[in-house]
Swiss-Prot record:
It is an enzyme of class 3 (hydrolase). This is Ribonuclease BN. Homodimer. It comes from the Bacteria. The active site is at 68 (proton acceptor). Activated by cobalt and manganese. Strongly inhibited by the presence of a 3'-CCA sequence or a 3'-phosphoryl group. Zinc phosphodiesterase, which has both exoribonuclease and endoribonuclease activities, depending on the nature of the substrate and of the added divalent cation, and on its 3'-terminal structure. Can process the 3' termini of both CCA-less and CCA-containing tRNA precursors. CCA-less tRNAs are cleaved endonucleolytically after the discriminator base, whereas residues following the CCA sequence can be removed exonucleolytically or endonucleolytically in CCA-containing molecules. Does not remove the CCA sequence. May also be involved in the degradation of mRNAs. Disruption phenotype: Mutants are unaffected in growth. Keywords: Endonuclease, Exonuclease, Hydrolase, Metal-binding, Nuclease, tRNA processing, Zinc. Zn(2+) 2 binds at residues 68-69, 212, 270. The gene is rbn. It comes from Escherichia coli (strain K12). NCBIfam families: PRK00055.1-1 (NF000800), PRK00055.1-3 (NF000801), RNase_Z (TIGR02651), true_RNase_BN (TIGR02649).
Length: 305
């Protein structure tokens, strides 16, 4: 999996940062997919500067209904249709997302020529496609807001082909069945259990993408043990009280959560427009003083998970 940040500014865009949107390229060899997390104004413009196009999108996850995470959605949906794209699209989001989308399309005389499903979510598991699952966790913000935990299912371990050949199993289709953990019957009547020839499963990757939030009870469960945690760092330590009063977090709070949750890497985003490049580096240093494995997301930065 890889993350591509399309927008990293909090509240309003700046000359170098658009408002929030994050692409997740699933990069699966047999089931490709491109997911979008939040869709602030101008997201479709940002998408034009990447190697991806809206036709590749199959799922959009909205954290909450504040404009800097949402106002780019109607335009993206319409442009996707006007480009002749017919692949289905599913939108997940809190209560009100359906009304927002349907109202925007209706009053502008717009529509989609592709199947569009809108799923209004609550806390809990919202998706399992057989390869990965997505769970929504409630956050602390003035509007109903969620963070998303994306977990790949464990992958089967490597098949011991050498041992199978020694046991008289010919390479070919039977190996595929054994790789799936099935039991096969050879021509001589012997039964071979694939599980006996598989190494330990390979743990899947886990990723936590937070919406806007102040410190909250669900944060630790959302982030616990993930490989990568994406979290806002709207304001610096000296402005922590102001951040919390508006349902946001400081650098210290983001980094402390990453340390307590035992994550592999913290990526900070959603930085206030008050910070220029020098100020953003200061935010990064504050986080690294608590959790060294911290990176700062800029627009179009790509991170592997």
């Amino acid at each position: 999996m890889e993350l591509i940040f399309l927008g990293t500014s909090a509240g309003v865009p700046t000359r170098t940062r658009n408002v929030t949107a994050i692409l997740l390229n699933l990069q699966h060899p047999t089931q490709s997919g491109l997911w979008l997390f939040d869709c602030g104004e101008g997201t479709q413009h940002q998408l034009l500067h990447t190697a991806f196009n809206p036709g590749k999108l199959d799922k959009i996850f909205i954290s909450h209904l504040h404009g800097d995470h949402l106002f780019g959605l109607p335009g993206l949906l319409c442009s996707r249709s006007m480009s002749g794209i017919i692949q289905p699209l599913t939108i997940y989001g809190p209560q009100g997302i359906r009304e927002f989308v349907e109202t925007a399309l209706r009053i502008s005389g717009s529509w989609t020529d592709y199947p569009l499903e809108i799923v209004e979510i609550g806390a809990g598991e919202i998706l399992d496609d057989g390869l990965r699952k997505v769970t929504a966790y409630p956050l602390e913000h003035p509007l109903e807001c969620y963070g998303y935990r994306i977990e790949e299912h464990d992958k089967p371990g490597a098949l011991n082909a050498q041992a199978l050949k020694a046991a008289g199993v010919p390479p070919g289709p039977l190996f595929q069945e054994l790789k799936a953990g099935k039991t096969i019957t050879l021509e001589d009547g012997r039964q071979i259990n694939g599980a006996d020839y598989l190494a330990a499963p390979v743990p899947g990757k886990a990723l936590a993408i937070f919406g806007d939030t102040g410190p909250c009870d669900a944060a630790l469960d959302l982030a616990k043990g993930v490989d990568v945690m994406v979290h806002e760092a709207t304001l610096d330590i000296t402005m922590e009280a102001k951040a919390n009063s508006r349902g946001h977090s400081s650098t210290r709070q983001a980094a402390t959560l990453a340390r307590e949750a035992g994550v592999g890497k913290l990526i900070i985003t959603h930085v206030s427009s008050r910070y220029d490049d020098k100020g953003c580096q200061h935010l990064l240093r504050e986080c690294r003083s608590i959790f060294p494995a911290t990176e700062l997301a800029n627009d179009f930065t790509v991170f592997n998970v």
